[in-house]
């Protein structure tokens, strides 16, 4: 007498563990802000002045605006936003030591990797600002990141990004080649292209001001020299048939979700 085949017992499989997105940068990852003085606490004053001069006037006036700061580092930009009355702010950074420093200053920051954090947060924010340069991503990674930002923003939401300016003939090439984790430069035209490819509209490109420390006399010297040089360079570009408006060391843009 033959025995009946035994029924197979199906055990439910465990849900797959999400894999962290491995980015191309090896030493200075995009989702962790590395640029800080040796005395990290001293940076709060200087970076507050820098961010106020470059970003504050481009943000929505409503202080309940939901703002995400990606690659927040020790919390410089988050600190400025909180100081200016924005109370619905969150910073994320992939380096727990930097986040720990921000939290010692009672800043709302947490450890997270940017790509994974943005996935599944559709329509969660009004403004997203990466504190790290876009060029710590490859071009494909940049567009992927910006599309994640677009999905995480509400309709009419805003992203503010920046990168190294390849149009500056003095520092453009050096900026690109001195760091193996710098993958490209942009100009005002190519930065606009990147944002358009990522689905953003109402793109406004602007220079990032370096000389914003008015108590330092050298600030005025630097501002005067760079102003004259940039004026002369615009004339040279015209002779080559190029209309270049932004020649600052770093170039930024604000863009909106349609």
Protein language model annotation of sequence segments:
Residues 135-137:
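A short His-aromatic
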Residues 107-110, 177-180, 221-223:
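Short, hinge-like loop/turn segments at secondary-structure boundaries
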């Amino acid at each position: 007498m033959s025995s009946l085949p035994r029924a197979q017992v199906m055990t439910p499989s465990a849900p797959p563990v999400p894999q962290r997105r491995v980015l191309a940068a090896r030493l200075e990852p995009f989702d962790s802000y590395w640029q800080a003085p040796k005395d990290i606490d001293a940076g709060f004053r200087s970076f507050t002045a820098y961010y106020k001069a470059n970003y504050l006037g481009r943000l929505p006036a409503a202080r309940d605006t939901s703002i995400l700061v990606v690659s927040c580092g020790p919390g410089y930009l988050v600190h400025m936003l909180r100081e200016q009355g924005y109370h619905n702010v969150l910073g994320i950074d992939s380096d727990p030591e930097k986040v720990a420093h921000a939290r010692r200053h009672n800043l709302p920051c947490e450890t997270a990797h940017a790509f994974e954090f943005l996935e599944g947060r559709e329509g969660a924010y009004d403004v997203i600002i990466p504190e790290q340069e876009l060029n710590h991503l490859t071009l494909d990674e940049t567009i992927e990141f910006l599309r994640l930002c677009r999905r995480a923003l509400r309709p009419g939401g805003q992203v503010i990004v920046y990168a190294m300016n390849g149009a500056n003939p003095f520092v453009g090439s050096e900026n690109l080649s001195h760091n193996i984790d710098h993958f490209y430069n942009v100009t005002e035209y190519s930065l606009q292209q990147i944002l358009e490819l990522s689905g953003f509209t109402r793109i406004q490109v602007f220079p990032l001001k370096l000389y914003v420390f008015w108590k330092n006399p050298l600030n005025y010297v630097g501002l005067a020299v760079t102003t004259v040089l940039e004026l002369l360079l615009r004339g040279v570009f015209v002779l080559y048939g190029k209309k270049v408006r932004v020649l600052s060391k770093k170039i930024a843009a604000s863009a909106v979700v349609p």
